[in-house]
Amino acid sequence: MSDAEDIPTGRKRRPREQTPVQRALGLLVRREHSRKELTRKLTARGIEDEAAQAAVAKLTEAGWQDDTRFAENLVRMRANTGYGPIHVRAELGTHGLDSAAIAAAMDSYEGDWQENARDLVRRRFGEAGPQDLTQRRKAADLLARRGFDGDSIRRATRYDPDD
């Protein structure tokens, strides 16, 4: 053997390629994902569709991935950041959840959507709320963009568009 072969090259070992289950688990450790979202992310990272679905199924069986838990967390998180039930329901639909799971998640929310609308208006317009018609319209537009229904908007802004 020559001396050149005995000298370490200083190169680091390449890390082993992660399995689809390991990659999916890495995503789930960061935050909850729906089955559809997790499968989509795995296939986007170059994992074959069948392998991605098998990995997600294995993690679902083991309790690491749960669409019900994901939906309940999303409802709570969006409600706490000022979004209304219409927006939240639509977002849950984009994550591939069926209507029964969406309804169950919305029913599990223990907060009050109208109180959330009032809180959002208070944060934007002060404790007294919107005073004149222009401010009430702006508050109503804000709540509508955030996904609140008409009844919640009227109660939170004391604004009736027929005035």
Curated annotation (Swiss-Prot):
Primary localization: cytoplasm
Region of interest (Disordered), ranges: 1-21
Single Gene Ontology BP annotation: regulation of DNA repair
Domain of life: Bacteria
Compartments reported by the entry: Cytoplasm
GO cellular component: cytoplasm
Keywords noted in UniProt: Cytoplasm
Family matches, as PANTHER family: REGULATORY PROTEIN RECX FAMILY PROTEIN (PTHR33602:SF1)
UniProt similarity note: Belongs to the RecX family.
UniProt function note: Modulates RecA activity.
NCBIfam families in alphabetical order: PRK00117.2-1
Name used for this protein in its record: Regulatory protein RecX
